[in-house]
Amino acid sequence: MTNTWNRLALLIFAVLSLLVAGELQAGVVVGGTRFIFPADRESISILLTNTSQESWLINSKINRPTRWAGGEASTVPAPLLAAPPLILLKPGTTGTLRLLRTESDILPVDRETLFELSIASVPSGKVENQSVKVAMRSVFKLFWRPEGLPGDPLEAYQQLRWTRNSQGVQLTNPTPYYINLIQVSVNGKALSNVGVVPPKSQRQTSWCQAIAPCHVAWRAINDYGGLSAKKEQNLP
């Protein structure tokens, strides 16, 4: 009986720990999961909401992408700015983060450009019991979208071409839009960190190197953070 109560107590403690962590991570809610910056706009706004009972200091910045497989590396500074870089959100309040264009004329006009929007939140209250509260950082995809691009960005994933070669599978994206892959599987095996396929480019992968038949299935994430219909293909 004692062992049963001990196991129950441990289970309750574990659940409560998860709930506390969830509340802490949900202290600041960002109004979106990905963002589109149309080239005909001078700025876009993002709503930040503090749902917790403590104040948070928000630090935001825009960088070139580094963390998504298939992303195009660049050492050129991002010609976009997050303002203000620091925002204090008191309990139960909202704030607005503005993304501004600075030198957008250096960006391609025939395709999208991908950036990272990094938003870190730090509890701004006093340090208690000599403990330090660390920042929680979230990174969002930010797409710069030039005017007049042909085609429908919501349908771009349907034009993605998959071709086998001696190195694996080559992905070809003929559209001017980024294709953000998700739920990709090869012969029924799910793949992780499948990343993106940049516009008007090819991406080589090591998938399907074996001689055996190769069946691929995938979805894409659209402008609104939703999932596309599932696509499947047998690769000879």
Swiss-Prot record:
Alphabetically ordered keywords of this record: Chaperone, Fimbrium biogenesis, Immunoglobulin domain, Periplasm, Signal
SUPFAM superfamilies: PapD-like, Periplasmic chaperone C-domain
Gene Ontology terms for molecular function: protein folding chaperone
Subcellular localization(s) per the UniProt record: Periplasm
Domain of life: Bacteria
Gene induction: Expression is negatively regulated by H-NS and subjected to cAMP receptor protein (CRP)-mediated catabolite repression.
InterPro entries given in the database record: Ig-like_fold, PapD-like_sf, Periplasmic_pilus_chap, Pili_assmbl_chap_C_dom_sf, Pili_assmbl_chaperone_bac, Pili_assmbl_chaperone_C, Pili_assmbl_chaperone_CS, Pili_assmbl_chaperone_N
Gene Ontology biological-process annotations: cell wall organization; chaperone-mediated protein folding
Entry keyword annotation includes Chaperone: yes
Pfam families: PapD_C, PapD_N
Signal peptide: 1-26
Gene Ontology cellular component terms for the protein in this record: outer membrane-bounded periplasmic space
Family recorded in the similarity comment: Belongs to the periplasmic pilus chaperone family.
Note: The operon is cryptic under classical laboratory conditions, but is functional when constitutively expressed.
Function description: Part of the elfADCG-ycbUVF fimbrial operon, which promotes adhesion of bacteria to different abiotic surfaces. Could be required for the biogenesis of fimbriae.
Stated name of the protein: Uncharacterized fimbrial chaperone YcbF
Upper lineage: Bacteria, Pseudomonadati, Pseudomonadota, Gammaproteobacteria, Enterobacterales
